[in-house]
Amino acid sequence: KELEVALLEGHADVAVHSAKDLPTEMPEGLALAGYLPREDPRDVFVVRDDVACPKVIATGSPRRRAQLLATHWPDVQMKEIRGNVGTRLRKISVDHEADATVLALAGLRRLGISEFPGLRFEPLPVHEMVPAPGQAAIALQIREGDVERYGAACDSITTSAVDFERAVLATMGGGCQVAVGVHREGDI
């Protein structure tokens, strides 16, 4: 909200957001210029090294919870987890609050995390764990009149894919806390 106010009042020209966290409808006077080239959209299953078959998986995401229960581990116990990435990894590795969690690969990469003591990282194929709409994409939010000015900074392939994913989400009446996964690759 703070960034949007800064844009509308002319104190900022561009606001940078994680696309998956944006509402499907922009506030009046604002628009999306598009998206920077998308990072790998897969989720990563992060499990303790000493666990062969997880009994408790921690995630705050309704989408991840629904997919894990429906396809991978229907009998596992799900637990809420909060905090930044480092905190979540410590809660699994050190505090043993759960056997595993699921995190976005793009987030781990942007933080420079490819390993963590006591944990193994297993990227999940997109067809097994469908990402959130806009996952791994960075959105550029601007004032409505500035679309042409900033559109050239955006990646057309990512913009086409994420616009489609967000349209599907909007059609379903969803937001970032809904158990909806959608991912577009290539031309339709």
State what each model feature region is:
Residues 9-11, 27, 40, 135:
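Short connector loops at helix/strand junctions that flank enzyme active sites
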Residues 1-18, 182-188:
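N-terminal hydrophobic or amphipathic helices and topogenic motifs
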Residues 2-3, 21, 64, 88:
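Residues within well-ordered alpha-helices
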Residues 8-17, 21, 94-106:
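Alpha-to-beta junction loops
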Residues 1, 27-29, 116:
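Glycine-rich loop at the start of a catalytic domain that most often binds anionic cofactors/ligands
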Residues 17, 35, 60, 81, ...:
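Conserved beta-strand termini and adjacent loop/short-helix elements that scaffold enzyme active sites
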Residues 67, 71-188:
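Small-molecule-sensing regulatory modules
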Residues 19-76:
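A conserved helix-loop-strand patch within extracytoplasmic ligand-binding domains
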